[in-house]
Curated annotation (Swiss-Prot):
One of its GO terms (molecular function) is rRNA binding. Binds 16S rRNA, required for the assembly of 30S particles and may also be responsible for determining the conformation of the 16S rRNA at the A site. It comes from the Bacteria. This is Small ribosomal subunit protein uS14. It comes from Orientia tsutsugamushi (strain Boryong) (Rickettsia tsutsugamushi).
Length: 101
């Protein structure tokens, strides 16, 4: 089980990301617009850098929905490998079973 504070910190980051996503995308699209002057684009970069760091998507860590474990995460199930193994073994996840050859 991951520390509750780590999980909460990550949730806070994802909420902030969702809140500022459109603003960040708009700034980035204007920054890459070659029709604007260099000075205007530089000012937009400064505006982007003034946004909170935690509003960036790279600051969000994928964590298991069950345990909060940050490693061995499967995006399809939003679970870590340990929990997937337990649930697949007990037949709770439909269509998933232990391989054998």
């Amino acid at each position: 089980m991951a520390k509750v504070s780590s999980v909460q910190k990550n949730l806070k980051r994802s909420r902030l990301f969702n809140k500022l996503k459109l603003k960040r995308q708009a700034l980035k699209s204007k920054i890459y617009d070659k029709n604007l002057s260099l000075e205007e684009r530089f000012n937009l970069v400064l505006k982007l850098s003034k946004l909170p760091r935690n509003s960036s998507s790279t600051r969000i860590r994928n964590r298991c929905a069950e345990t909060g474990r940050p490693r061995g995460y499967y995006r399809k199930f939003k679970l870590c490998r340990n929990i997937i193994r337990e649930l697949a073994g007990s037949g709770i996840i439909p269509g998933l079973r232990k391989s054998s050859w």
